[in-house]
Amino acid sequence: YAPLGWYGTNYVGLRGRMAILSEAYSHADFEKRIRVTHDFVAEILEYVAAHADDVRRIEREADRQTTLEGAGLAPRPELAVAYESASRGTEPVPLVVMRANPDTTARRRAIPTDTVRTFVLPIYDHFRATKTRGLPAGYYLPPSERAIADLLRLHGLLVERLDVDWSDSVQVFGVKEEKWADRPFQGHKLLALTGDYAPAVMRTLPAGTYFVPTAQPLGRLVFSLLEPEGYGLPRWNVFDRLLGADFGAYSGLVYGSTAVAEFPVWRAVRAPRAPRTALP
């Protein structure tokens, strides 16, 4: 399994809600998998029903804490944009000894024996960040990108539009390399961007610019979807038409910048104090 937000269990967690993955591995026969899955899910539902008040309290606190962090009323955390698997150490693990299936035409090439042996093995049970970025106050999208704003709304995110021109400090991501995957994954050649943020600069944001605040219960999801180095919308080609030869030119055209190779979503140092209207 992977820590990426596009997997359903992880996505629910990014929304500040609890999720548990249920999987029945294929080494068990079909009947056993069905029975074990039923019992596992029933046990979870019974536990949640018995602890419903605690679950609601924890999730409400997650909403509150995330909103405070985005607003700068609590320390803004460093959040992961890249990960690696990590081990809690080695432990003795009892394993059933398998033997070769004498039926070479069978689907299962190994079958279990009655022998159990214990091996000391590393237990990889979590992920750790290999690269982090600080949570910003929000993200600015070009006024022309209504389709992207609508996509964010489909995720339930608060998206606002500036009613007037506004000048403020922003962080701009300078792209050093764009690398598309050689093979498609679910119909997409995933895009990896590498680069860095320049020190905050003053930029003028025209009326109509979209602002997506992190001061909302789904603030972590905002970060996950819009950080250029992560596994969100940039990775899934949502910004591809703004990249390539016209990348810098487009960014400059929209925002009046003379810089090149700028990712066209800017990080807000603080929420704009300009009048703005929330999208329906």
Language-model segment annotations:
Residues 55-62, 174-178, 195-201, 245-254:
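Low-complexity, flexible helical/coil segments
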Residues 66-73, 182-189, 256-264:
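A general structural signal for short secondary-structure boundary/capping elements
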Residues 142-144, 214-217:
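Short, flexible beta-strand-to-coil junctions
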Residues 218-222, 226-280:
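Accessory, solvent-exposed terminal regions and/or long lumenal/extracellular loops of proteins
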Residues 1-170, 174-175:
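Hard-cation-handling environments
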Residues 48-51, 167-170, 187-191, 238-243:
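Short, surface-exposed, polar/charged, turn-prone segments marking secondary-structure boundaries
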